[in-house]
Amino acid sequence: MSDENDNGRPGSNPGGRAPITLKPRQGSVSAGVVKQSFSHGRTKTVVVETKRVRPHAPPAGNLAAPSSAERRQGDAPRQQSSSGGGGSSAGGLSQGEMLARQRAIEAAREHQERQAAERRAAEARAASEAAAARDAAAKSAAAAKAAAAPAPEAPAAPAPTPAPVAQAPAAPVVQAPVVAAPVQAPAAPVAAAPAAPRAEAPRPAPPPVRSDAPRPAPTAGQTRTYEPSRDRRDDRSSTTTYRPGPGAPPQGDRPQGDRPQGDRPFNQRAPRPDGPYNQRTPRPDAGGPPRGPRPEGAGGFRNDRPQGDRPQGDRPQGDRPQGDRPTQTVRYSALAPRPAPGARPGPGGPRGARPGVPASAPATPEIQRATRSAPRPGGDVGRKPEEDDDRRKAAAPGKAVSRAKGAPIRREGRLTIQTVAGDGDSADRMRSLASVRRAREREKEKRRGGPADVVKVAREVIIPDVITVQELSNRMAVRGVEIIKFLMRQGVMLKINDVIDNDTAELVATEFGHTVRRVSEADVEEGFIGAEDVDDHLEPRPPVVTVMGHVDHGKTSLLDALRKADVASGEHGGITQHIGAYQVRLESGQKVTFLDTPGHAAFSQMRARGANITDLVILVVAGDDGVMPQTVEAIKHARAAEVPIIVAVNKMDKPGADSTRVVNELLQHEIVVESLGGDTQIVEVSAKTGQGLDELIERILLLAEVMDLKANPDRTADGVVIEAKLDKGRGAVSTVLVKRGTLKRGDIVVAGSQFGRVRALLNERNEQLTEAGPATPVEILGLDGVPSPGDPFAVVENEARARELTEYRIRLKREKSMHPVGAGATSMADMMAKLQDKKYRELPLVIKADVQGSAEAIIGSLDAMSTDEVRARIILSGAGAISESDVMLAKGAGAPLIGFNVRASAQARALAEREGVEIRYYAIIYDLLDDIKGVLSGMLAPIQRETFLGNAEVLQAFDISKVGKVAGCRVTEGVVRKGAKVRIIRNDIVVLELGTLQTLKRFKDEVPEVPSGQECGMMFAGFQDIKVGDTIECFTVEEIKRQLD
């Protein structure tokens, strides 16, 4: 560092080198004066250099990299400059500084080469992508061939100067295009243009100008100049300010119309006309290697170039024209190439229209592209995003997608949800296509002079049992307010969500001109059982015979003799408690299906069920016993089912058997046999000896032939559930009788409120079957629950139909259980009155049976036992073993568990012992019903019976201290006894009812009783109101237990 007095003396340095000074070189950079203070108290004034850091990179799409030839031409002046001045004469730099500068220049050159390589790679990609645009550009290329002329290469820039300013790049080679596709060159890319003007002769670069000197306004010939933006040092390092010159188009936002679609090849812009703009090298990115200095004085000043700083005033503001641009394909990526534009006019000349853009742009459309007002992928040159947003929000009439200040712009130009729908206020301002369509329709209606008449369309409206006003309006395609107005005119005030019945809904629909089709929930049952078969498809089937009669008259033994089996010996108590179905193959090859019904009175429903599904009835009557009550009941069931009867007089092998007695007893019930001129056949049989069995079979086959029993086996199966049970290991097992069609394995069956797919078919001998034809009894496995005996079953087409049917039936069953009808029905008031009177008592029970039919028989018998005072309340009934859940349910209800032919599991037994729940097992229905009848009888209130003893009259009343009142009486009738019940009557009014004679004395001695005619003293428990003349009636009360009938 030198003193300021040594400045300007070149010879003072002994080495011949120029002194190192902080003074700025003339015309290079701006300088300033700074006073330094040292620790020893000395001060010194030094001159410092003011540098402006410009870490901006050139715009990638506007400036081309110099070719290799240009780099060689640019390197020569630098070498001459460095060698001519020696080691220190070139700008006053030392050898180390020069080496450092050379290294920086080489690094900059390598950086430019890398950029050129990247451009060439991008050009190669763009060439393949521009194939689609060649056809459109070929038409303009033909007109451009005649006017196209190649432009000469621009000279290289002179040697650099020490000033830290960026180099001026060599001018890119501009050639006339042959085709619209970009051509790859080793130096700079050649842009396609319809007519490129001839480039000017190269001019030497002007000397560097001080950056702080004022700059004149640009001339008319200098149209555009790219200069790094001073306002965006902190925003984007590669942003360049685009400043227009005089005669340039107006600044501000670009037109908001759609741009031409299609991708533009990377960096394939049209050749620039002659002029000084765009003649500078790209500036390095911030933090990159420093560029070499400009050469000083190479070629002298360019007089045509304005010097000095640019005007510091604001740029021209305002919006650009708002006309629409031709539609173009939306570029979703910021790196996607742009379509090749047309050639630009010369400086100061008039600008032609862009390719595809009309001369006069139309007005802005009603719906603008949501991405139109967003910045370009590369960003506007020299403009901050905040300024762009402010200007475009204030000036652009289109819908702009909002973006927070300082938000990243890397996704600009991409199609996103925010771009389409907007956010915040922009989403509220965005008009939908439907809104625009409605606006257009309103305009058309205004031009036509009013809205067009709406033609009402008559529809078929489906109306269920109940429907809301809203649903009715939807089905009629009418506004709900119109229906409400109509109902108001009819005097009905309803809201949109109110429910109306089907009659009102039909009236409304008819008033509006629609046709009505009424449906109901019960319509799901339609088609469950198929239609009747055509006679041409019918084939003979086996007869179904039901054996009925009184208990212990030999029905099962007779079937065993016919089947040559022994079923009766295995039954509990020797009686049948289940309905059985068997198919017997006769010696002739014919088949007969037999149904065995129980004879006990409890199984009345089973007998009725068997009579309804049979073709004929065999009425078994014991020859030694005659007609019994269940025999009469069987006759009634057969008549109700309108089926013929064959009377079989059994046990004819016994000595006391008399068939004539049986015939006479049947006459009392209007059963006339053939021997007496009737139509009922009678056969004398013996199941033990086999007497008359063949004749019985002949009568059955003859009657079946007369009845001409036929069915169609080639249709879907349907029939009746005979019995059902829950078997451990097999699940729900149902015994069904197929009436029509053929039941196959895999069919979907609906039985009552249960459905499932048939997994197995078993006959009475437990043999697997693949199918079961008409009049065949089988056991089916696969249902999801145990159906009720007597329920019809049918095969449906799919599970959806089966589920629809079962859900409807379950809903009906639940509604019936919630609202019972008949004898068991009672209102809440009646039940509360009975509970308050303590006269209504219930016995809760949980019943589990082996089959569903037995459970129904038990429940029916218990219902018959009920009276107005006591009744059995069934908490749960079902088929299957007793489980732990049954035990817990019985504990909660305080009910005993009844098991009929079933047992409890080990876990259920242990749980019942811990919880104190009683489990009772029964195998015969007699025992079960007798025990339950005894329990219900014990719950009945006993009958109180009075026994008269005697009367006494009160002669005098004594009031004794510490004792109370004592009545002095005389026994007038009978005898009075100590401890007996008394009734005190005064003036024919009972004063005390059911009092107790506590003390009885004769004179001073207590006596047990006093006979008639004697006097005594009496004192009553809890009663002191004794007066002379009262009559005392003495009696005893006896309680007698009641029994159910």
UniProtKB/Swiss-Prot annotation:
Residues 83-94 have a biased composition (Gly residues). Residues 549-556 are annotated as: G1. One of its GO terms (molecular function) is translation initiation factor activity. GO terms for cellular component: cytoplasm. Residues 540-710 form the tr-type G domain. Pfam families: EF-G_D2, GTP_EFTU, GTP_EFTU_D2, IF-2, IF2_assoc, IF2_N. Its main location: cytoplasm. Residues 124-151, 184-199, 352-363 have a biased composition (Low complexity). GTP binds at residues 549-556, 596-600, 650-653. Keywords: Cytoplasm, GTP-binding, Initiation factor, Nucleotide-binding, Protein biosynthesis. Residues 650-653 are annotated as: G4. Residues 103-123, 227-237, 302-323, 381-393, 438-450 have a biased composition (Basic and acidic residues). Residues 574-578 are annotated as: G2. InterPro entries: EF-G-like_DII, EFTu-like_2, IF2_assoc_dom_bac, IF2_II, IF2_N, P-loop_NTPase, Small_GTP-bd, T_Tr_GTP-bd_dom. Residues 596-599 are annotated as: G3. Residues 1-169, 184-451 are annotated as: Disordered. The keyword Cytoplasm applies. Belongs to the TRAFAC class translation factor GTPase superfamily. Classic translation factor GTPase family. IF-2 subfamily. One of the essential components for the initiation of protein synthesis. Protects formylmethionyl-tRNA from spontaneous hydrolysis and promotes its binding to the 30S ribosomal subunits. Also involved in the hydrolysis of GTP during the formation of the 70S ribosomal complex. This is Translation initiation factor IF-2. The lineage of its organism: Bacteria, Pseudomonadati, Pseudomonadota, Alphaproteobacteria, Caulobacterales. The gene is infB.
